Every structure is written in C-alpha cells, then in structure tokens.
Design a protein with these regions (language model features):
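Histidine-acidic residue clusters that define the catalytic metal-binding segment
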Residues: 23-41, 175-214, 225, 242, ...
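An aromatic/glycine/proline-enriched structural segment found at the starts
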Residues: 21-28, 215-280, 437-471
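M16/insulysin-pitrilysin zinc metalloprotease superfamily fold
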Residues: 90-93, 120-151, 281, 300, ...
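Buried hydrophobic packing residues in well-ordered domains
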Residues: 46, 64, 81-83, 103, ...
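Acidic/histidine-enriched segments that form metal/cofactor-coordinating
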Residues: 26, 100-204, 250, 367-386, ...
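Sec-dependent N-terminal signal peptides
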Residues: 4-13
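Short acidic/His-enriched helical or mixed secondary-structure segments at domain edges of catalytic enzymes
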Residues: 153-172, 250-269, 307-316, 360-413
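M16/MPP (pitrilysin/insulinase) zinc-metallopeptidase core fold and M16-derived inactive scaffolds
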Residues: 63-123, 186-187, 299-315, 328
Length: 471
C-alpha cells in the first residue's frame, strides 16, 4: 500500500512538471466578422432607409432613429422626457388598448421614444408591425389624461431623489462639467416640469420628430424590393421639416485641478467623481486606445481603481471609469461611492491611479486580456440584429469608413502600450480635472482641506455657495 502511494505521488509530481514544461498554446486566429452592407434609398422628405436581408431566421427588426443635435429645453426642461414617456400609447388612428392588444396578439415587440422607435416580429407579420410602428411614431395620441399621469410620475420621482446622494452627485457632475446652459448640463426641477403643458409636448414633437436626420434600418427575413414600396407608402407622407439650429456655449475644463464639494448632511458615504470633458470621435486614431485605457483604469474588478480602492483598501464595493464619444462633446468620469472616513485618502488614490496610467506602460499581458475581452464581446454582439442596426447607423451618423466594423478586431489587436499611454495623456486631464464630491461635510471637509487642493463649494443644484460652517 505504501509503495503504491509513493508511486502515485511520483506520477502526480511528474505530470505537473511535464505540464509546466509544456509550451503554452498559441492564440487562435482572430475570428472573421462579415457584416453585410445595407441596400439604401432615400425618401423625398429626407428619411434614409437601410435594408439588410438575412433569411436565416423568420424574423425582422425595424429601427427608426433620429440623429438630431442636442437642444436646450431651458425653463421647460422635462418636455422631451415627458414626450418620450407619452409617445407609443396608441395613435390618433388606433386606441391605446387596441394598439397594445394587437401587438401582443402578434407576439411582437414595439418601443417608442422621442428619439425614434424599434420593433421586432416574425417576418410573416412584418408588414402589419411596420404599419403599427409608423402609426405610433408619426401619429402619436397625446392626450391630457396621459399627460397628467406621466407628469405626476416624474414629479414623484423628483421628490424621491431630493435627498438621494447619488442623484445629487450626478446632477452636479453634469451641471459643472457641461454648464447649466448646455443640453448635457441642464437638469429638470419641479418648477421646470410644472412649466410644461400638453401644447408644449405637441410643439416639441412637431419641431424635433422630423425626417430630416432620420434613419430607418430594416434587418432580417425580408426582401428589399418588397419592403421598399411599403416604406414609401407608410413614411412618404411624413412632412419634410428642418430642426432649428441652436447655439449654446461649449463646455470648458477648469484651468487647474480642484475639489468641487457638495454638502449633503444625510450622506453615509461620499460620492466621488473625477471629471473632464473631451471631444473623441469614433473615427479618431485614438478612439480604441482611449476606450481601452478607460477600461484598464476602471472597467471591471481587475482594473486599476478596483484593485486599489476595493481589493486593497476595502473602501468601496466598486469603482468605474467611463468615457464618452461621438460627434458632440462628451466626458471622462472616474467614480466611486467611498466610506466617509476614507474620502480624502480615496482622492489621493484616484489621482495616483490616473497618474499611473499616464506615466507607466501597461503590461502586455493585461492589455492583451482587456483586448481579448473586447473582441469576445464584439463577436457576441455582432450576432444580434440590434447590433447590426446600430453599426449601420454609426457608419452613417459618425461618418465612419464603410469597413470600420470589418476591421474592428484588427484595429483593437493593433493597440500597443504606447498607444494607451498616449491616449491617457491626451484625454485623462490630471491637471484640469474637477474632483466632485457629494458627502457629509462635517465629517470629510477637514481631511480634504489637508490635501492642499483648491476647494470650492456648491449646493445640490450646482450653484456656488460659501463654505459650510459647523458648530
């Protein structure tokens, strides 16, 4: 028995040693992604239609998208969200209940909003579903009853958020980063919502729900020659109108890094956000390096911020970084909800990790793991009709090369540690960052003042105030 045990142990150790000496398998060949090019036509009113035939499954999706410029709602902030919530409740031709019952009966899915509409169904019902989509989108039934109901919901939501630290923090982040006179910086209040009338909803819809910058993407088991006359019949009467061109101030980053503090006496932890604005288009050379750098900084639980703030320090359940992109100004935000007693220390560690990705090359292994994750998610997404529709729209609206998504994997694989560092130095503005903190001032201000970072104080709506005085 003893000899048998020794023999098994020797065989076990030998197996381990052989496994260690065995060369690691080489990475497999990157998958080839073939994205079918859409067939297109444009209606006289400006609506651009893209059709991608795919007869593998008997399903069709329709995606109507409006690519309008952001606009300022001003003293009636909330009019667009109210309209967004009201559209889709039937149409002027079909009552709400009958509309919804027919959709359910056909086993379809239809969603409407102020920026477009989406529908999916079995291909044998596609003609009727497209008709319902056109009906709901182009002939919405805005009634006083629905208006009062949706307005009451929004007002209730605003009241519920009055003392919510995350809600206060998010509002102030947007207001300070973009400015309150910018579409991304203005916020809805009880007063601005009360200013909105049913007539405003209708006017806003007629002003911005227009075919000038609209796209209809159709994907699935449908034939171009058959769907083209149907689209022309349903959408050809959509009145041709242009959206107004509105000017608003461009956001400006602060001239020096500073703490912008919001005192929230009921806070049990501090909401910390490091924010700067940027212009990053999907077609830019640094798009992929910037996106991947952001993921390395705070994209998952193995990111720099999480390994420090969560795993090492135990101050938070999680931290994250997000970077915006597109035709319009966006923001980079690194954020976390931190235990109050560690607020000042967390600020130091945030800065440390951002400085690290700007000054130290990321390891090749870590970079390869992150790239592999991106590629894996892309390959999974590319199988979905919604993704194909989004890719087709992006190529048009973001003015991307026609082969942007065919080269997606190759472009990601080409990103190097030097690219990451270059992008981080360009977009992670360590010397021009707002460190926006919403927390209990009586507990955290003394520690923050010791950091020798200039501090400015704001109320929960982003208005400058004096430093709080505590007895």
């Amino acid at each position: 028995m003893k000899k048998t045990t020794i023999l098994l142990f020797i065989l076990f150790i030998t197996g381990i040693m052989q496994a260690q000496n065995r060369p690691q398998p080489k990475p497999g060949v990157s998958p080839i992604v073939n994205i079918k090019k859409p067939q297109t036509f444009i209606l006289d009113n400006g609506l651009k239609v893209m059709v991608v035939e795919n007869h593998k499954l008997p399903r069709v999706t329709f995606n109507l998208a409006l690519d309008n410029e952001p606009f300022v709602e001003g003293s009636k902030k909330g009019v667009d969200e109210l309209g967004n919530n009201m559209i889709g409740n039937g149409s002027v031709k079909i009552a709400k209940d009958a509309f919804n019952e027919e959709i359910d009966f056909l086993g379809a899915n239809i969603n409407f909003g102020s920026k477009g509409a989406y529908a999916s169904s079995l291909s044998k019902y596609s003609g009727r579903i497209l008709e319902l989509l056109a009906n709901g989108a182009l002939h919405p039934n805005f009634t006083q009853e629905e208006f009062d109901k949706e307005k009451a919901k929004l007002l209730e939501g605003l009241k519920a958020e009055e003392k919510s630290v995350p809600a206060i923090a998010n509002r102030v982040v947007e207001a300070l980063a973009f400015g309150k006179n910018h579409p991304s910086g203005e916020y809805m209040t009880e007063q601005t919502l009360q200013n909105v009338t049913l007539a405003d909803i209708k006017t806003n819809y007629e002003t911005y729900f227009v075919p000038e910058n609209a796209y209809l993407v159709i994907i699935g088991d449908i034939k171009y020659n058959e769907v083209k006359p149907i689209v022309e019949n349903l959408f050809g009467s959509w009145a041709k109108r242009k959206t107004p061109k509105l000017a608003y101030p461009a956001p400006q980053n602060v001239p020096f890094t500073q703490i912008n503090f919001v005192d929230v006496p009921n806070a049990v932890q501090s909401e910390i956000s490091l924010v700067n604005t940027l212009n990053l288009k999907m077609g830019d050379k640094d798009f992929f390096p910037a996106v991947i750098a952001t993921y390395i900084l705070g994209g998952d639980y193995s990111s720099y911020l999480n390994m420090n703030l969560r795993e090492k320090q135990g101050w938070t359940y999680g931290a994250n970084s997000i970077i915006g992109s597109g035709k319009y100004v966006a923001k980079l935000k690194s954020t976390s909800a931190i235990r109050s007693s560690a607020t000042d220390s967390a600020v130091v560690e945030f800065i440390k990790e951002i400085k690290k990705i700007r000054t130290e090359k990321v390891s090749v292994d870590l970079l390869n793991n992150v790239k592999a994750g991106y590629i894996g998610r892309f390959v999974m997404q590319v199988q979905k009709p919604q993704s194909i529709a989004r890719y087709a729209l992006n190529i048009e609206t973001e003015e991307l090369p026609a082969d942007f998504y065919e080269n997606y994997i190759k472009t990601i694989n080409a990103v190097t540690p030097d690219d990451i560092m270059r992008a981080a130095n360009k977009y992670f503005l360590l010397d021009n960052t707002r460190i926006i903190i919403a927390g209990k001032g009586s507990e955290v201000i003394p520690g923050l003042e010791k950091l020798n970072i200039p501090m400015f104080y704001f109320d929960k709506y982003g208005n400058p105030v004096e430093k709080p005085v505590y007895k």
